Amino acid sequence: MENKLSFEEAISQLEHLVSKLEQGDVPLEEAISYFKEGMELSKLCDEKLKNVQEQMAVILGEDGVLEPFTALGDEA
């Protein structure tokens, strides 16, 4: 998977693959290929999101102290 894709481009490609698979008229071999590509795109998006979360944690930290990112719903 090309890592030079932007997050938005990767999401768009992932949505396109999901749409093809949801139609249900895709030959099995092609469906497997789409699924593998979709998993790679999903991993790429996850990596990009984690990178942004790390950057935001640094940016939003008080007095230069790194504060961990807490997603909504993760608070205990």
UniProtKB/Swiss-Prot annotation:
Gene3D superfamilies: Exonuclease VII, small subunit
Catalytic activity annotation: Exonucleolytic cleavage in either 5'- to 3'- or 3'- to 5'-direction to yield nucleoside 5'-phosphates
Keywords associated with the record: Cytoplasm, Exonuclease, Hydrolase, Nuclease
Heme as UniProt keyword: no
Any GO CC annotation of this UniProt entry: cytosol
Origin: domain of life: Bacteria
Documented EC number(s): 3.1.11.6
Record's keyword annotation contains Disulfide bond: no
A biological-process GO annotation: DNA catabolic process
TM region(s), chain numbering: none
Localization of this protein: Cytoplasm
One annotated GO molecular function: exodeoxyribonuclease VII activity
Annotated function: Bidirectionally degrades single-stranded DNA into large acid-insoluble oligonucleotides, which are then degraded further into small acid-soluble oligonucleotides.
Subunit structure: Heterooligomer composed of large and small subunits.
UniProt cross-references to PANTHER family, sorted A to Z: EXODEOXYRIBONUCLEASE 7 SMALL SUBUNIT (PTHR34137:SF1)
Family: Belongs to the XseB family.
Name the record gives this protein: Exodeoxyribonuclease 7 small subunit
Species for this entry: Bacillus cereus (strain ATCC 10987 / NRS 248)
Lineage, uppermost ranks: Bacteria, Bacillati, Bacillota, Bacilli, Bacillales
Encoding gene (name): xseB
